[in-house]
Swiss-Prot record:
Keywords: Lyase, Magnesium, Manganese, Metal-binding. It comes from Clarkia breweri. The lineage of its organism: Eukaryota, Viridiplantae, Streptophyta, Embryophyta, Tracheophyta. Highly expressed in cells of the transmitting tract of the stigma and style and in the epidermal cells of petals, as well as in stamens. The Asp-Asp-Xaa-Xaa-Asp/Glu (DDXXD/E) motif is important for the catalytic activity, presumably through binding to Mg(2+). Mg(2+) 3 binds at N689, S693, E697. This is S-linalool synthase. The gene is LIS. Mg(2+) 2 binds at D547, D551. A motif (DDXXD motif) lies at residues 547-551. Binds 3 Mg(2+) or Mn(2+) ions per subunit.
Length: 870
C-alpha cells in the first residue's frame, strides 16, 4: 500500500513538472524564447550597462539599458564575483574560472561608472585581488588562452582608469606585464578583421586599445562587418562598443532587440540564436534527459518544423567565424531527425568536408571546436550502409577528438575545455552508441555540467540556461527517480518468479536474473509496459539456465528428452532439472499467450511453442557437434544454427506479442522468417558473443565462428579472424540501424523495430570489449546507479539580492520616452557623455595623415595607458 501511495504521489508531482516545462519552454504562446535559451553573460551585460541614456544629462546621467545595471546589482555572488546565471556557485573560490575575472572587472567598472554600490565594489575587488594570481599563474603566459590574453589587460586598464584599485604581488605584476606584451604581439601580428582565427580580433572590439587603430579605418571595418541584424559578429559587448564608436543606428536597434528579449536584464554572449538551433537544442536536452515519453507531441511538432525548414533552406556562403554555430546546429539536426525516423541526408552537415579552408580552420582550432566535433561524431553513429560522407566525417572527428584527449592537462589548452566535456568525449569514443543503456545515459546527461554546453564562444562555452531552470532539472531528476521506483519493484517481482520456479537453485548454472532485468530495463527509455520488460527478463533467465544445462550439466539422453518434450510440449518423462526448465518455460509461454489474447484477441500458442522448440533444437545440435557425435559443420552451417541458438529473436518475438492492442501479431509471425531486421539481429548478436568468448569456448571444446573462420582459411591468424568478424559486425550493424531508423526498407511498427534495437544494445553492452555477462560483479555499480542511487546534480544557489536600488537620478521616468533611432538623437548620446574616468577622456592621437580620433572612440583611449597596479 505504501509503495502504491508513493508512486501515485510521485506520478502527480511528475505530471505537474511536465506541465510546467510545457508552459515555460515549449508552449508556442511563450514569449521571449531567447531569454530561455542561453545563459546570461555578466561581461556582456556590463558593457550594455555602460551606455548612457541620450536624454538624461544631469549629474552623471543614467544608463540607456537600466535593466542591465539592475541585473548587475542583483547578481553578485556571496564570494564577490559575477558568473553566468545558472552556474554552480559553491561556497569557495575553487570553481572560479578565468572568465569570472573578466566578468567581475566589467561589472565593477559599470557600478563605478554610475557611482553605485561601493560595498559591492569593495567585495568584488577583494575577489579579484584574492584570485587573480591563483588563476593566471596556473599556466605560463604563453599558455594562457588567446581570448584572455587579449581581454584581461584591457579590463585591467579600464579598471585602473576607473579608479578601481587592485593590489597584486610583484611576481604577478611581472607575469601581467608579459601577458600585456603577448597581447601587443597579437595585435601587431593579426589584422583586426582577419578571419583565420577561431575568434577574429573584431570580436574583441571592446578590448582593443583605441590608440592602436585609426578611427576612420576602424569605422569602415565595423560597417563592413555588421550583420543584417545590426550586430558585430553576434556579440553584444562588441556591438555595444561598435555603437559607441560609430553611432550606427543598426547597432542600436540590435541592442534594443537584445534587451527586449531578455526580460531579467541579463544578456547572453551570443545573440540572436537561430530558431532551428533553439528548437533542436531543446529537443536534444529533453531526449538525452530521458523525457521523450512525456513530450512526444511537442517534440514531433518541433522536429517537423525543423525538417521543413531544412527542406527549403538554400545553401549560402559560410564565414569562418560562423562555422562553429552552423556545424553544431546541422550535425545536431541530422542526429535528432534521423534518430526519430525522419528522412535526412548526411549532406546537411557534411558540407564542411568539401571545403579545404573550413577543414583546415577546424583542425587548426580543434580545441575550440571540441563540442562541435563531438556533435559531428555523434551524428555519424547513425550511419547507414554506403554513406561514404559519414565515414569520412567520423574519421575526421575521431582524429581531432583523440588529439583533444591526448593534450592531458586540459587547463593548458587554448580553449577552456572543462573536465566534464573531457569526460563526455572519452565516453563517446570508448563506448559504442549501440552498447549504451539509455537509462544510464540519461543519468550521465543529467549529472554532467557539460551537457548544457553548446559551442565555444568568445571566452567560454555558450550554455543552455533553460536546462538549469529549476523546473527542467527537477523534472529530469523526478522522472529518473520514479523510473527507479518502478524498476526496483519489477526486479523484485522477477526475482520472486525465478525463485518460485526453481531457476535460482539449480546449482550448475549462472544466476543472472539481476543482470538480465537491468539490461532490458535500462536499454531503452521508451514507454514499454511492465509486461514487456518482465517477459524479456523471464525469457532471458530461462534461456541462460537452459543453455547452461545443454553446455555443462545434461547428458545427451537428458538433452534429447528435453528437446523432444518441448517439441511435444509435454513434460512427461523429464527428470528434475529438465522438468524445472520445462515448467518455467511453460509458465512463461502461458503468461504471454493469455496476455496477448486479452490485448489482441489472438491465440499464439502454436507460434510460441514452435519458436522455443527451434531454439532448443539448435542447442541440441551444438551439443552434438561439441561432443563429436556428428561431423563438424562448415562456417555457413554453423552460423545458420548459431543465429538461432543465441536466442535473441526468441526473446524479442516472445515479448513483441505484448507491445499493445492492435499490434499485428499474426502478420509478423507469418513473416518472421523473412524479416531482415530479425535476421540481422540474430547474426549480430551471435557474432558479438563469439568475438568475446572464443578463448573460453575453445577451452570447453565448443564451436565458435572465430575459430572456424581461421580453420577454413589456412593463411589467417587468430587476429585476422577477429578482424574479419569485426568487419562483418560493422557492416551488418549499419544495415541493422538502417532498418531500425528508416521506413524505406523496413515497413514495420516502430515499437517492433525499437524492441529489436534494444535487444542489440543489450548484447553489445554484454559483449563490447569483454564478456561482462559471465562476470559476477562488473555490473553491480551500474545496477545500483540505475535502480537505487538518485542522480547527483549540482544544487544551484540563488545569488543574494542586495538591498541596492537605483538612485532617483537613475530611476526611469514615470512616462518612459521612446528612443527615436535617427542620426540626430544618436548624436545626443555622445554630446552628453561626460565620463568621469580617465579612460574615457578624449586623447589626441599624433596623426600621420589619418586625422584625429573620434570622441566616440575614446572609451579605451589614451596613447600610453599602462597596467594600473598599486
Amino acid at each position: 500500500m505504501q509503495l502504491i501511495t508513493n508512486f501515485s504521489s510521485s506520478s502527480s508531482e511528475l505530471q505537474f513538472l511536465v506541465d510546467k516545462v510545457k508552459r515555460e519552454s515549449l508552449s508556442s504562446s511563450s514569449s521571449n524564447t531567447q531569454n530561455l535559451f542561453l545563459s546570461t553573460s555578466p561581461y556582456d551585460t556590463a558593457w550594455l550597462a555602460l551606455i548612457p541614456h541620450p536624454h538624461h544629462h544631469h549629474h552623471h546621467g543614467r544608463p540607456m539599458f537600466e535593466k542591465c545595471l539592475q541585473w548587475i546589482l542583483h547578481n553578485q555572488t556571496p564570494q564577490g564575483f559575477w558568473a553566468a546565471a545558472g552556474d554552480n556557485i559553491s561556497d569557495t573560490d575553487d570553481d572560479v574560472t578565468l572568465d569570472c575575472l573578466l566578468s567581475t572587472l566589467a561589472c565593477l567598472v559599470a557600478l563605478k561608472r554610475w557611482q553605485l554600490a561601493p560595498d559591492m565594489i569593495h567585495k568584488g575587488l577583494e575577489f579579484v585581488n584574492r584570485n587573480t594570481e591563483r588563476l593566471v599563474m596556473k599556466q605560463k603566459p604563453s599558455d594562457v588562452p588567446r581570448w584572455f590574453t587579449i581581454m584581461f589587460p584591457a579590463m585591467l586598464e579600464l579598471a585602473g582608469a576607473s579608479s578601481l584599485r587592485v593590489d597584486f604581488s610583484e611576481n604577478l605584476n611581472r607575469i601581467l606585464v608579459e601577458l600585456s606584451q603577448n597581447r601587443d604581439d597579437i595585435l601587431t601580428r593579426e589584422e583586426v578583421d582577419e578571419k583565420k582565427q577561431y575568434s577574429p580580433l573584431l570580436l574583441f572590439l571592446e578590448a582593443l586599445p583605441a590608440q592602436s587603430y585609426d578611427n576612420d579605418v576602424l569605422k569602415q571595418i565595423i560597417d563592413k562587418n555588421l550583420s543584417n541584424d545590426g550586430s558585430l559578429l553576434q556579440s553584444p559587448s562588441a556591438t555595444a562598443r561598435a555603437y559607441m564608436i560609430t553611432g550606427n543606428t543598426r547597432c542600436l536597434s540590435y541592442l534594443h532587440s537584445l534587451t527586449n528579449s531578455c526580460s531579467n536584464g541579463g544578456v547572453p554572449s551570443f545573440y540572436p540564436v537561430d530558431d532551428d538551433l533553439h528548437d533542436l537544442v531543446m529537443v536534444n536536452q529533453l531526449t538525452r534527459s530521458g523525457l521523450t515519453e512525456h513530450l512526444i507531441p511537442e517534440i514531433d511538432h518541433l522536429l517537423l518544423k525543423v525538417q521543413k525548414n531544412y527542406k527549403y533552406k538554400k545553401a549560402s556562403p559560410k564565414s569562418l567565424y560562423s562555422i562553429a554555430a552552423e556545424l553544431y546546429r546541422d550535425s545536431l539536426a541530422f542526429w535528432l531527425l534521423r534518430v526519430n525516423n525522419h528522412w535526412v541526408s548526411p549532406s546537411i552537415f557534411c558540407w564542411f568536408l568539401d571545403d579545404d579552408e573550413i577543414r583546415d580552420h577546424i583542425e587548426t582550432n580543434y580545441e575550440e571546436f571540441a563540442a562541435v566535433l563531438l556533435n559531428v561524431y555523434r551524428a555519424t553513429d547513425l550511419m547507414f550502409s554506403g554513406e561514404v560522407q559519414l565515414v569520412e566525417a567520423r574519421s575526421f572527428a575521431t582524429k581531432n577528438l583523440e588529439k583533444i584527449l591526448a593534450t592531458g592537462n586540459i587547463h593548458k589548452t587554448n580553449a577552456d575545455i572543462s573536465s566534464s566535456l573531457h569526460k563526455m568525449i572519452e565516453h563517446e569514443l570508448r563506448v559504442p552508441w549501440t552498447a549504451r543503456m539509455d537509462h544510464v545515459e540519461n543519468r550521465i546527461w543529467i549529472e554532467e555540467i557539460a551537457s548544457s554546453a553548446l559551442w565555444f564562444g568568445k571566452s567560454s562555452y555558450l550554455r543552455l540556461s533553460c536546462f538549469h531552470k529549476m523546473s527542467l532539472q527537477q523534472l529530469a531528476v523526478k522522472n529518473y527517480t520514479l523510473r527507479q521506483l518502478v524498476y526496483r519493484d519489477e526486479l523484485a517481482e522477477v526475482e520472486r518468479w525465478s525463485k518460485e520456479r526453481g531457476l535460482c537453485d539449480m546449482g550448475f548454472c549462472r544466476e543472472k536474473t539481476g543482470y538480465c532485468y537491468y539490461a532490458f530495463a535500462a536499454s531503452t527509455c521508451l514507454p514499454w509496459s511492465s509486461d514487456v520488460r518482465l517477459v524479456l527478463t523471464k525469457a532471458a533467465v530461462v534461456i541462460t539456465v537452459a543453455d547452461d544445462f545443454f553446455d555443462v550439466e545434461g547428458s545427451m539422453v537428458d538433452l534429447e528428452k528435453l528437446t523432444d518434450a518441448v517439441r511435444r510440449w509435454d513434460a512427461e518423462g523429464l527428470g528434475s532439472h529438465s522438468k524445472t526448465i520445462f515448467e518455467a518455460l511453460d509458465d512463461l509461454v502461458n503468461e504471454v499467450r493469455l496476455k496477448c489474447f486479452q490485448q489482441n484477441g489472438q491465440d499464439i500458442k502454436n507460434n510460441l511453442q514452435q519458436l522455443w522448440y527451434e531454439t532448443f533444437h539448435s542447442w541440441l545440435m551444438e551439443a552434438k557437434w561439441g561432443k563429436g557425435l556428428t561431423s563438424k559443420p562448415s562456417v555457413d552451417v554453423y552460423l545458420g544454427n548459431a543465429m538461432t541458438s543465441i536466442a535473441a529473436h526468441t526473446m524479442v518475438l516472445t515479448a513483441s506479442c505484448l507491445l499493445g492492442p492492435g499490434f499485428p501479431v499474426h502478420q509478423l509471425w507469418s513473416q518472421r522468417r523473412h524479416q531482415d531486421i530479425t535476421s540481422l539481429l540474430m547474426v549480430l548478436t551471435r557474432l558479438l558473443n563469439d568475438i568475446q568468448s572464443y578463448l573460453k569456448e575453445e577451452d570447453e571444446g565448443k564451436i565458435n565462428y572465430v575459430w572456424m573462420y581461421m580453420i577454413e582459411n589456412n593463411q589467417a591468424s587468430i587476429d585476422d579472424s577477429v578482424r574479419h568478424v569485426q568487419t562483418i559486425i560493422n557492416v551488418k550493424k549499419q544495415e541493422f540501424i538502417q532498418r531500425v531508423l528508416s521506413d524505406q526498407h523496413c515497413n514495420l511498427p516502430k515499437s517492433f523495430k525499437q524492441l529489436h534495437f534494444s535487444c542489440l544494445k543489450v548484447f553489445n553492452m554484454f559483449f563490447n570489449s569483454s564478456n561482462i555477462f559471465d562476470t559476477d560483479t562488473d555490473l553491480l555499480l551500474d545496477i545500483h546507479e540505475a535502480f537505487v542511487s538518485p542522480p547527483q546534480v549540482p544544487k544551484f544557489k540563488p545569488h543574494i539580492k542586495p538591498p541596492h536600488q537605483l538612485p532617483a537620478t537613475l530611476q526611469p521616468p514615470h512616462q518612459p520616452q521612446q528612443i527615436m533611432v535617427n542620426k540626430k538623437k544618436v548624436e545626443m548620446v555622445y554630446k552628453s557623455y561626460h565620463h568621469p574616468f580617465k579612460v574615457f577622456t578624449l586623447q589626441k592621437k599624433q596623426s600621420s595623415g589619418h586625422g584625429t580620433m573620434n570622441p566616440r572612440a575614446s572609451i579605451l583611449a589614451g596613447p600610453n595607458i599602462k597596467l594600473c597596479f598599486s
